[in-house]
Amino acid sequence: MNAVHFGAGNIGRGFIGEILAKNGFHITFVDVNETIIQALKERKSYTIELADASHQQINVENVTGLNNMTEPEKVVEAIAEADLVTTAIGPNILPRIAELIAQGIDARAEANCQKPLDIIACENMIGGSTFLAEEVAKYLKNPAYAEQWIGFPDAAVDRIVPLQKHEDPLFVQVEPFCEWVIDDTNRKAKEIQLEGVHYVADLEPYIERKLFSVNTGHATVAYTGALLGYQTIDEAMQDALVVAQLKSVLQETGKLLVAKWNFDEQEHAAYIEKIIQRFQNKYISDAITRVARTPIRKLGAQERFIRPIRELQERNLVSPHLLAMIGIVFNYHDPEDEQSRQLQEMLDQESVDTVIAEVTGIEDPETVKNIKQNVERYARPQVA
């Protein structure tokens, strides 16, 4: 069986690629990084190492690569012949691959291919595949064919893969834990059952549990750690103040998840404890700048902080630690990160209230006032 995977970065190789290879797929990685693509073409394999005491190495074979900038026709051809298409490129990049995917679907239609195909966006976002489907639809010549044969099931993915540099451009280190959950209701290729993947009738509880626990938690450690001067997640997790803030934030999101989705309280408490242990993994040195990047996106209305705050308010539940986190994020400075620079420019040029409303989408004056107080509370002293 053939899989096309967009995104040959660490998550693509270190998570999705590993699962697909274990299930017997030949994988064509699609990326614009010529160094990685060339190495995949030449070697047709790469190595994953688990970040724990075992340092177990896993060899992933039967792979190749295509550069979608220089070889778009071959990418279209690969999609036309694929049994599965997946992505791990980042939510902001999905629209850029939509046209190529549409061309691949249209090529299947022209060849009268009557083999169902699922296209799964494995991204840190709610409804990633649904969003990708909407983008792809803009370019389709034969939408009726796509409606019949192409599925875009949403997915939730979870594995910490830190930024890393190795002499070997294909070598990747990952945490042992991984979770990939797929919405079974929107699949077309039902005959494909991936081992190591959970198929569920209702994905939303799992996506929200992951987003509001792992992503909210990871970001909490990163921004709180940055405020206290730490460089890596594992360093920050040695500080009792950071751990206390993390636990408080996850208790607040946990209240929402239990109330909304009827998760068992004790099971969810164990899930939170597992997350804390994962963040404390001394074998992973994950840069705070990686986890804290793109703060404007992370402050979005549907994202890891604002959405739980809003939904807790709707249930008359308080979220003081989440609101404190918004103040901390607004004060995050990373000159290397475009959105961090942009956010600080906005705060320099407009009133704090205006920027809060603009970035978060929050309209309630009382909540804006509360966030403003937290922005001022965590402001760094200005150096003359």
From Swiss-Prot:
A biological-process GO annotation: mannitol catabolic process
One MF term in the entry's GO annotations: mannitol-1-phosphate 5-dehydrogenase activity
Alphabetized SUPFAM superfamilies for the sequence: 6-phosphogluconate dehydrogenase C-terminal domain-like (SSF48179), NAD(P)-binding Rossmann-fold domains (SSF51735)
Residues holding NAD(+): 3-14
Catalytic activity: D-mannitol 1-phosphate + NAD(+) = beta-D-fructose 6-phosphate + NADH + H(+)
Its EC number(s): 1.1.1.17
GO CC annotations on file: cytosol
Coiled coil (residue ranges): none
Keyword Transport among record annotations: no
Keywords annotated in UniProt: NAD, Oxidoreductase
Leader peptide range in chain numbering: none
Subunit structure: Monomer.
Family: Belongs to the mannitol dehydrogenase family.
NCBIfam families: PRK02318.1-2, PRK02318.1-3, PRK02318.2-5
Protein name: Mannitol-1-phosphate 5-dehydrogenase
Origin species: Enterococcus faecalis (strain ATCC 700802 / V583)
